[in-house]
C-alpha cells in the first residue's frame, strides 16, 4: 500500500471517525450513486476489495458478498454490523485467495487504486481478471486530478491518505492493459469541493 501517514490519517483508523468523515465528504452518496448505476443483476456475486466498513452492502440487494480489507478494526466492525449478510476477511486479496473463491459478477475497488503503487495495481488487476466472470464488471472509484480543478478540491485530494492519485488518462491506461471495454465518469462535487472518477470495465 502507498500511504501518507500523519496524526489525522491515524485517527481515520477508528470506524466511527472514518464513517463520519466519509459522510462529511459525501463519500457515502457517491458510493451509492455508482453502485446503483452499475449493479443491475439480481442476487449478484460481489467481491469488494478494500471493503473498509462493508458499507457497500447498504446499496446492493441480496448479494453473495465477500469483503477483503487489511484493517482488523474495520473488518471487526463490518462483521458486527452486517453479521451474516457477507463474508468479511482480514487479509490481502492475492493468488492464494483466488483458489478459495467463486467467480464474481462484480468486483469493487472503491477508493483503492490511489493507495497502490503502479506495480501493485498491475498485480491486483491480473488477479481480478482470474476471479471475474466472462460477462462480469470491475467497478472503481477514486479521487482524480483534472485540468482547471477547484483549488480546494485539489488541496483536499492532495492530502488524501493515498499517494498515487492519477489523471483520467493515467487511470484508463492501466485498466486498458486488462480490459477491452471501459466506461468512465468524472463527478465534480460542489459541497465540499471534491472530484471523483469512476470506471466500469468489462472484458
Label the predicted regions.
Residues 112:
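Hydrophobic adenine-recognition pocket in adenosine-nucleotide-binding enzymes
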Residues 1-100, 116-123, 127, 137-203:
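Class I (Rossmann-like) S-adenosyl-L-methionine-dependent methyltransferase catalytic domain
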Residues 108:
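A conserved beta-strand element that flanks and buttresses the S-adenosyl-L-methionine
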Amino acid at each position: 500500500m502507498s500511504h501518507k501517514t500523519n496524526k489525522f490519517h491515524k485517527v481515520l483508523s477508528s470506524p466511527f471517525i472514518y464513517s463520519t468523515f466519509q459522510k462529511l465528504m459525501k463519500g457515502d452518496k457517491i458510493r451509492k450513486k455508482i453502485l446503483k448505476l452499475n449493479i443491475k443483476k439480481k442476487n449478484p456475486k460481489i467481491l469488494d476489495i478494500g471493503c473498509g466498513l462493508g458499507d457497500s452492502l447498504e446499496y446492493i440487494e441480496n448479494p453473495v458478498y465477500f469483503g477483503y480489507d487489511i484493517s482488523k478494526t474495520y473488518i471487526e466492525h463490518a462483521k458486527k454490523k452486517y453479521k451474516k449478510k457477507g463474508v468479511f476477511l482480514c487479509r490481502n486479496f492475492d493468488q492464494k485467495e483466488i483458489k478459495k473463491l467463486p467467480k464474481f459478477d462484480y468486483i469493487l475497488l472503491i477508493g483503492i487504486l490511489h493507495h497502490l503503487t503502479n506495480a501493485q495495481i498491475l498485480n491486483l488487476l491480473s488477479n481480478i481478471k482470474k476471479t471475474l466472470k466472462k460477462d462480469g464488471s470491475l467497478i472503481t472509484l477514486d479521487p482524480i486530478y483534472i485540468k482547471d480543478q477547484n483549488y480546494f478540491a485539489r488541496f483536499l485530494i492532495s492530502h488524501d491518505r493515498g499517494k498515487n492519485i492519477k489523471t483520467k488518462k493515467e487511470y484508463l491506461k492501466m485498466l486498458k492493459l486488462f480490459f477491452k471495454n471501459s466506461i468512465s465518469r468524472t463527478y465534480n462535487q460542489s459541497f465540499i469541493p471534491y472530484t471523483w472518477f469512476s470506471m466500469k470495465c468489462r472484458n
